[in-house]
Amino acid sequence: MSTMYAASREALTQTRAALSSALGSVSAGAATAAAAQIGAELFSVVEILDEQRTLRSALSDTSTTGSVREGLAERVFGSKVSAETLAVVKSAAGQDWSVTSDLLNSLVLLGRESLLKAAADQGQLDAVEDELFRLGRIVAGDPKLEQSLSDRSVPAKGKRDLLSKLLYGKVTAVSEALATQAVGRLKNSAPADAFDELSNLAAAQRKAVVAKVRSAAPLSSEQSDRLTATLTRTYGKPVTVHVEVDPELLSGLVVRVGDEVIDGSGAGRLAALRKSLK
């Protein structure tokens, strides 16, 4: 998600509070289903706004009052979404956003957070994070599929349908919902990058650090567990380890956590040796 100015950051904070209130308004037994429904419906709202420029401009027009924009949101979406989702959309419409795109992007983000809450309630957050990471690696390694999913001449619905067919029955419902929404609204992102962003968001929801590891050979379960334990001690919080096999490393590992890179690979040592001999 792109950096927002102060007005939009405050608007997002207020709208997120409305989402929390909406989720808190339902009974405990219905909370998981409500979170999933709100997430899916927020995606549908954004899809409508993407298609209707006049409407999205009106909902973010700061020359009108927040109450006027809330009334417009209720008239347009009141019969299309649940009362809980409508409360979130009205709150968003009532805020003053720096630019219209911040309104839409924030609704997408809150939709994702709501779906991830549903996954967490079902004990599936780890699985969702891993599925989205692996999906990113699969797409990055399949140029034909990546081209199909990023082709701007293909309508968003066509790309969503293609990915949905590929994922059906193979991943959790939350992973499928998140991935298909993202691929239909890539903007300037590559599909693999969009899936990585979703995986990172899932990790953030459980306050985990993501370590992306490239290994010259597959790691055994014992090696993976030791690496995870070591990184957890190093960073002082839970660490999720995502491993890719890269034979070009010759031996060892390259670990990336955020902007920090630990290069313990054979290729890295050779490169350092060559540099020292110059």
UniProtKB/Swiss-Prot annotation:
The keyword Membrane applies. The keyword Glycoprotein does not apply. Coiled coil: none annotated. It is found in: Cell membrane. Belongs to the ATPase delta chain family. PANTHER family: ATP SYNTHASE DELTA CHAIN. This is ATP synthase subunit delta.
